[in-house]
Amino acid sequence: MTTTARLFRPLAIPALAALALIVLALAAPARAESVTPLVSSAWLKQHLGDPDVFVLDVRSAIDGGGAEAFLKGHVPGAIHSDYDKAGWRVTRGGVPFMLPTLPELEKLIGELGIDEDTHVVVVPAGVHFTDFGSAARTYWTLKVAGVAKVSILDGGHAAWVAEKNQTESGASKPSPKIFSATLNNALLAEAGEVQKIEQSGGATLIDARPASFFAGKQKAPAAKAYGHIPGAVNADSATFYDAQTNRLKPQAELAAIAATLPGGPAVAYCNTGHWAATDWFVLSELLGRKDVRLYYGSMVEWTSDASRPLASARTKWDDLKKTLGFGS
């Protein structure tokens, strides 16, 4: 063996080890980045066999579906959890559609077969902007509970079928896991915090309802009064959605819409935290805006206390039309 060979041979193993560490370090971020807020049907088809990928079908009466629609056909291996009935929103303190408690979240999520390491792909029906809100609210709830890897199937079940992907019928039985929830307070806003914002500022209140609700011409049945939280700006969740494709609009269009809103911290709300979940999802998850939260109690909780202020363009004529049966 030459002197040169003797000098370099012992370095071969450490050098390879160092190279391996570099490769692993570079690969780790790439793997983390692969979990995107929206995934395509092609991506889901490719990853259906992955042990950590969990397909969560949330179709409900909101989209004209539910358990019956799931039984007729769903993404292979999917587990159904009715957004409207399973407990994703609960009544607390007499106020409906609220975020479940931590123990309730642990039970709901764990019994489905989801834990902290699961990559959940939420599948809505894919038929309407309100239906997308079901997926966005479920996505937000999972994130709030501490599930780090969550995505929504772009276009939902309708897109999966339209792209001629395989479906299966019948019931799917979950395999429960132990799930320990860790509440992510950075994603949510409570009524007290919103009241401080209304009084003193510090964040933009974004009302995700249609303009007629914002103006006080309409209200949700569960809300006690008309109008909006004073100082809020209106950003109807439907403006982010393309009704022709039943998907969110392209990224550039979403960014253009979002650019019309004030910058800085923001809190989205609507009637029940459903439409507002779409605004939150677009701003926070797709556009990467920092410090965007969801006031899940929204107008139903806000108006449950008559002392909380409201702004409204409602007139006596609007009230008269309602009395006569011509208005809301």
Where are these regions (language model features)?
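Bacterial N-terminal signal peptides that target proteins for export
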Residues: 2-17
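Thiolate-centered catalytic microenvironments shared by cysteine-dependent enzyme domains
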Residues: 99-200, 218, 227, 275-292, ...
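Active-site neighborhoods of enzymes that stabilize oxyanions during catalysis
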Residues: 33-34, 38, 46, 89, ...
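Positively charged, proline/Ser/Thr-rich regional signature most characteristic
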Residues: 33-116, 125-130, 197-262
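Sec/Tat signal peptide C-region and signal peptidase I cleavage site
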Residues: 26-32
